[in-house]
């Protein structure tokens, strides 16, 4: 084990001893606190039970005194209860109500301290039966939503029970008894007290929603209640909802009630931890001093040895720059001096080897690089020569083809020139025809516009004709109406003439003529109406047909505009084609002259290229010989480079 580990082991032993001391102190203090709390809580429960006894005794004494006094007066129940009202009113925090019930007259009354009410005697017979054979009776119940403990005492007159007197002890959160039990019964900050009947029913709890519940339903009190019923251990520890709790019980002397005082152990132990904090701080300071003394005395030696071990490790890995310093007169200093001498001797030897290896490596690298470059250049030159030779051969073949092609181009250029001239003449004819077509389309457009105007006017005439037919129809209806009225008048006139006898005969002839004229007018109007009906039908057909014609004219007008637009575009494109044909003709004439000159020049170039090809064939054979020699030199240089790299690898392990 190294010295450093031994030092740390010693420190760990010291710290472990301190921790063990802390634990023993904590256990001792915790046990002392628990014993002290147990004793204090038992005394607290006894004191609380005495308080409950005094409270219950006071209530029972008041009830008995009232029963004794009232039993000798032969009062009616209402009058008895009216006297109890003052007692309830003065002690609201103790009493919730009072009542009396008399058996001989079946009367009963109740007071809450504010008023007295007559009540049904039958509702209180249960109390009379419950107190039979007893001098006092307690009944837990709820009065107007308030939990109470009802105390019932019999009224005796001349050794005969004539009724009962009862008081309801207030058990709500506002009552003195609740505050005393819950607040004074807490064994810790979050604890509380309980008042429970002998059959396990809860009378007082910090949450009065648990009133009259079985104490076993609350959780955690089962063991304490069993000990109370059996008269066993008064201090009970248990775990509830993951927390350690304790409960102390005490029986209320003279009554079948139990007081339970409960609290949380953790809250009490927290107080104990505060008490032991000073002792723990003292131990911590003492341990810190010991730790500091060990650290100051041992760490310099450990640090020096670690430094030397690190230097030896680096020296063994080849780092010759390590310097061993010999300071002091101890054994560690002698080791440092021996290491220093060995390092100097080895360093001189390695430096010489490194320098020789560097020179050899540099020379071999230069030879290798030069030979590789020479070999690569030879290979590249050979490849380039092949490419040039291939290109020259290709060029010679291409020049031959180009020469024949140029001659063909010259002949074709002349043909193209003639063709373009013919094409120019024909395109001009097409242009002329397109212009004439455009003019005719525009003329057709004018005619279509006139037709459209005529159609619009015809549409207006038809509308006027329809309106006139409607007017005539209205006039005919008027005439028909007049004819009917005239016929009616003629009929009336004939009737009057008949009444007048001979004097009215001339008038009857006139009336008959008027009637005939009216009938003819009626027939004429009917004929006119039939003709108008036929005319209207014809007009409707004409109007429907004219609508279709108008729509067709509109479509023709739109299509005429579109055709005119397309003709104009065609004319523009034809003019562009004419311009391109003229340019092509001029270019063809120029290319014909140039092609003849190119054919002559290409013959001369072909001859020169053939001479170059012969020279390249001779140069290729020379380059192949040079490439073979360069490859041999490169192989020898590569072998020398490998040997120098091996030597460099060996000496690189050392750092000087």
Curated annotation (Swiss-Prot):
Residues 299-351 form the HAMP domain. PROSITE patterns: CHEMOTAXIS_TRANSDUC_2 (PS50111), HAMP (PS50885). Residues 370-606 form the Methyl-accepting transducer domain. The modification Glutamate methyl ester (Glu) is found at residues 401, 407, 590, 596. It is found in: Cell membrane. GO terms for molecular function: transmembrane signaling receptor activity. GO terms for cellular component: plasma membrane. InterPro entries: dCache_1, HAMP_dom, MCP_chemotaxis, MCPsignal_dom. Its main location: membrane. Chemotactic-signal transducers respond to changes in the concentration of attractants and repellents in the environment, transduce a signal from the outside to the inside of the cell, and facilitate sensory adaptation through the variation of the level of methylation. This is Methyl-accepting chemotaxis protein 1. It comes from Thermotoga maritima (strain ATCC 43589 / DSM 3109 / JCM 10099 / NBRC 100826 / MSB8).
